Amino acid sequence: MLDPLKTSSYDYNLPKNQIATYPVTPADSAKLLIFNRSTNTIIHSTFKDILEFLPNDLSIFLNDTKVIKARIFGVKDSGGQIELLLNKPLFMDRYLVMIRGKVRVGTKLLFDENLSAIVEEVDEDGSRIVEFFQDEKKLDFLSLVEILNKIGHLPLPPYMNREDEKQDEQNYQTLFAKNYGAVAAPTASLHFTPELLKNLEEKYGLNYLTLHVGAGTFKPVDVEDILSHPMHSEYFEIGIDAKKNLDKANKVLAVGTTVTRTIEYYARTNKIQGECDLFLNPANKPIKVDYLLTNFHLPKSTLIMLVASFIGLEKTLEIYETAIKENYRFYSYGDGMLII
């Protein structure tokens, strides 16, 4: 029996050939499933025609975070190879990272470009806190990003099951990516072309906020009671203009789950900057966002639970089943859905 508060209820079976490992071109030729809540109907279209389905009186919000080449390979000074994934910066030029390979507190890690790191702490979940240096000089975030963009790799999601390629540098960034800090792209926005963005800007105006997507976005919910899940936190900022437009907005379309969580966190706390750890689910529904544009998400993830916060568990599973039957492509490089 389905229970919206049980993780096992959010499971579904997806054929492997429907996991998108590369995007379609052009980007707006991706399929778009539109679910209209007032008529309880599903329409199949493409992103190119999205304006046909959007209400007139609408404020659109997007995430302008930029993905870092956050995956780097190196060695321990004592020998032995390691792989490091930068998750996010902390205070005082310290960084939360994930490391593949055994490393203890005090271990020194060596990388190209004379980059090194020293492990300062080990978190309960196995993450490490490190400091980065170049030629023994401690690095601030922007200096680190500059080096990572020379030696690092884009951290493609594990379900793509492939290494990053040159074309991903363009494909896995949004057209409006501006503020470095994410280790995953806000994927609903990968479907836009310059022309489509221009048309949306002319009709509605576009608003940008920032949430730096962290590695926690891929963390599975591994407890059966979803309300016991420890939600990850991610840094966000809402600028003055975006805040003004959000406050006076009549109807809000959030492009992606990251935008949804940012706006809903602001609606609950009135904070325009900080760490967002909001977990939206059927027991914690949206209060500010009216419409959602998003991709199709992993089973048992907080992201599919967020979708269910808009339309309920049963309707979410029904739509996903329809998308599978209609051969939609799933996950980061896949097709999308619009809830109106």
Curated annotation (Swiss-Prot):
Keyword flag Transferase: yes
**Gene Ontology annotations for the cellular component aspect, listed alphabetically:** cytoplasm
Instruction: Look up keyword Nuclease and say if it applies.
Output: no
Q: What Enzyme Commission number(s) does the record list for this chain?
A: 2.4.99.17
Q: Name one Pfam family in it.
A: Queuosine_synth
Name any Gene Ontology BP term. tRNA wobble guanine modification
Top-level lineage group: Bacteria
Q: Where does this polypeptide localize? A: Cytoplasm
Q: Which UniProt keywords apply?
A: Cytoplasm, Queuosine biosynthesis, S-adenosyl-L-methionine, Transferase
Q: Its annotated pathway?
A: tRNA modification; tRNA-queuosine biosynthesis
One example of the protein's molecular function in GO is: S-adenosylmethionine:tRNA ribosyltransferase-isomerase activity
What's its catalytic activity?
Answer: 7-aminomethyl-7-carbaguanosine(34) in tRNA + S-adenosyl-L-methionine = epoxyqueuosine(34) in tRNA + adenine + L-methionine + 2 H(+)
User: Which PANTHER family does the entry link to?
Assistant: S-ADENOSYLMETHIONINE:TRNA RIBOSYLTRANSFERASE-ISOMERASE
Q: What is the annotated quaternary arrangement, including any partners? A: Monomer.
The UniProt entry, under NCBIfam families, shows: PRK00147.1, queA
- What HAMAP family is this protein classified in? QueA (MF_00113)
> Its function?
Transfers and isomerizes the ribose moiety from AdoMet to the 7-aminomethyl group of 7-deazaguanine (preQ1-tRNA) to give epoxyqueuosine (oQ-tRNA).
Q: Please report which protein family the annotation says this sequence is part of.
A: Belongs to the QueA family.
- Specify the protein name: S-adenosylmethionine:tRNA ribosyltransferase-isomerase
What species was this sequence derived from? Aliarcobacter butzleri (strain RM4018) (Arcobacter butzleri)
